[in-house]
Regions:
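N-terminal basic, amphipathic alpha-helical segments
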Residues: 1-112, 121, 316-322, 344-349, ...
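Short beta-strand "wing" residues that participate in macromolecule-binding interfaces
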Residues: 57-58, 147, 399
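Short loop segments at secondary-structure junctions
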Residues: 69-70, 279-280, 288, 303-307, ...
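Conserved core of the PLP fold type I
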Residues: 119-253, 264-283, 441-447
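Hydrophobic residues in well-ordered beta-strands that form the structural core
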Residues: 178, 199, 257-259, 330, ...
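PLP-dependent aminotransferase class I/II
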Residues: 284-360, 365-369
Length: 448
């Protein structure tokens, strides 16, 4: 083995063993060369090898830093440092409010009777149960989408509903138009299904219809995947006028749409679903995970009538069916008002957390919405997303770098997403204060 690779192996072992921590700066290459008794050119090859392995990131004029995640990890997944210290989790977004378990428990008690439990443990089909279809249909109607129960297809969660609808709509090799910043797991779903994601220009009102038409003219788009309500990560809600333009555009071009509205429940005054404007083309995806709890959830898609069988087949073949127990619990929570009470509490909770962001990150460029559970922080120069993520992790805080959301080539944004829903409120306040200090110190020193 070449000498530089042996040295790289030793540094890699220090990183994976926790002796070199995320965010820690490696010495300049000349200093590294002197310390190891090697030529500067060999030190350069060591650093290049560490970059190739995904263990460090180099910033011209700033230095080389240990990355925030392992090379085979996905940004936004790890919850503990290598050394075992818990992180303040501003990556994953699992909002819970005080007293949530006490609200949920009463509806589950009757399911513990042997007769009820036996029914709830039976296999569930993609069509769910009549009671589940009726309950979700009523929920959707309150959100501005009258949906016939027979158009509803159930899955285990929203990710599975997205995967099933895309699998039903797009053949391997097909092109799917998306916002240039999109839900990271859609990138994984597309890779697994063999789909090509095509970034579409957006502006302050949402996706640009002309960008859809131009991309479709270049090579036909098989579908669009859009987040018109509280877009993740930017919190943008597409304007009502732009939604009408998009509906006209997809009607004219005949492009089906997967509309992700998983966060729309937080903003009752927001725009209506795109599916209400183009019901023959739009497949609306939603879930109870954010409204209720991520551990016992139900996802669903409202599908055009002529696509119901195809989406149901995709659910079966993917093994993405909802559990009967979760369906029965959902019916009870929707019927007794539990979901409505949790939604009201989470709307208030999200607004309190956004006020913390506004206060602790005052003076920075932060894109968000008062109703959202996340914020998109455009970092001050000279910070880069990867190095800031590593520096945050070195301070015990996990954030998601902008690269996790980017689609297509081009310069990635120097931004991070802050997930506000998982950390307890006092912990969130302290974490935001710490991050503000890290950002200011790095910007002042010019060492981002």
């Amino acid at each position: 083995m070449d000498d530089y690779r042996r040295i790289a192996d030793r540094i890699a072992a220090d990183i994976t063993g926790g002796r070199l921590r995320p965010g820690q700066r490696l010495p300049p290459q000349r200093a590294f060369a002197r310390r190891h008794g090697i030529a500067p050119s060999t030190a350069g090859r060591v650093y290049a090898e560490l970059v190739r392995r995904g263990l460090v990131v180099g910033e011209v004029g700033r230095g080389t830093f240990v990355r925030a995640t392992a090379p085979d990890g996905q940004p936004g997944i790890a919850l503990t440092e290598a050394a075992g210290a818990p992180l303040v989790n501003l990556e994953l977004n699992y909002p819970a409010v005080p007293g949530q378990s006490e609200l949920l428990a009463p509806a589950l008690a009757p399911l513990l009777r042997p007769d009820a439990l036996g029914e709830a443990l039976r296999p569930a089909a993609a069509a769910g149960t009549p009671a589940a279809r009726a309950a979700v249909s009523a929920l959707l109607a309150r959100g501005g989408l009258p949906a016939a129960p027979e158009r509803i297809v159930f899955t285990g969660n929203a990710r599975q509903a997205i995967a099933a609808t895309l699998a039903a709509l797009v053949r391997p090799g097909g092109r799917v138009g998306v916002e240039p910043l999109t839900y990271p797991l859609v990138k994984e779903i597309a890779a697994r299904l063999g789909l090509a994601l095509v970034p579409l220009a957006t502006d302050a009102e949402g996706p640009v219809p002309q960008a859809v038409a131009d991309a479709h003219r270049s090579a036909p788009l098989s579908a669009l995947y859009l987040q018109p309500a509280l877009h993740n990560p930017t919190s943008l809600t597409t304007s009502a006028g732009r939604l009408r333009q998009l509906a006209d555009c997809v009607h004219r071009l005949g492009i089906p749409v997967v509309e992700d509205r998983i966060w729309a429940f937080l903003d009752p005054g927001g725009t209506p679903p795109l599916a209400a404007l183009a019901p023959g083309l739009v497949h609306l995806v939603d879930s109870l995970s954010k409204r209720v709890a991520p551990g016992l959830t139900v996802g669903f898609a409202v599908v055009p009538r002529d696509r119901v069988k195809a989406v149901a087949r995709a659910v079966r073949s993917g093994g993405w069916s909802a559990g009967a127990f979760a369906l029965e619990a959902a019916v009870r929570w929707l019927g007794d008002g539990t979901v409505d009470r949790l939604v009201a509490a989470k709307r208030q909770d999200a607004r309190r957390r956004q006020r913390l962001v506004a206060g602790k990150l005052a003076g920075f460029t932060v894109r968000s919405d008062p109703a959202a559970y996340f914020a998109w922080w455009e970092l001050p120069a000279p910070w880069r997303a990867d190095t800031f993520t590593a520096a945050a992790r070195a301070h015990g805080i996990a954030v998601t770098p902008g690269t996790a959301f980017c689609v297509g080539p081009g310069r990635t944004p120097d931004a991070v997403r802050l997930g506000l829903g998982s950390a307890p409120e006092p912990q969130l306040a302290r974490a935001l204060q710490t991050l503000a200090g890290v950002a200011r110190d790095g910007a002042a020193a010019g060492t981002g």
